[in-house]
Design a protein with these regions (language model features):
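Conserved N-terminal catalytic/coupling substructures associated with nucleotide/phosphate chemistry
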Residues: 1-99
């Protein structure tokens, strides 16, 4: 982790990855690739994937909205593509002041 101007910037590594929301939604969804990353984390020390954050960004886009069904659908799809991979979901809500 790097701290710049009082902001923590997570560096992608063997324990942490950021993925665009496009990786798990719409025609660009690539669940086999996401499942592969989950298996890699499970085979190591575990890890964290934050969805909805674009490469080079530290927060999701301000206008981004996530369908409330998406997290459960994601877990079900990953479970269907893997064996013995435990997924723990957590959610974060980011609020900004646009004024």
């Amino acid at each position: 982790m790097i701290v710049r101007r009082n902001k923590k910037i997570m560096i992608e590594n063997s324990l942490y990855d950021k993925k665009s929301l496009r990786a798990i939604t719409g025609k660009t969804a690539d669940f086999p690739e996401v499942a592969k990353d989950c298996v890699a984390f499970a085979n190591a020390q575990g890890g964290k994937i934050e969805f909805g954050i674009e490469d080079g960004d530290t927060l999701p886009p301000v206008s981004q909205v996530i369908d409330e069904k998406l997290p459960v659908d994601l877990v079900n799809k990953i479970a269907g593509l893997t064996n013995n991979v435990v997924i723990n979901l957590s959610f974060a809500v980011f609020c900004t002041n646009n004024s």
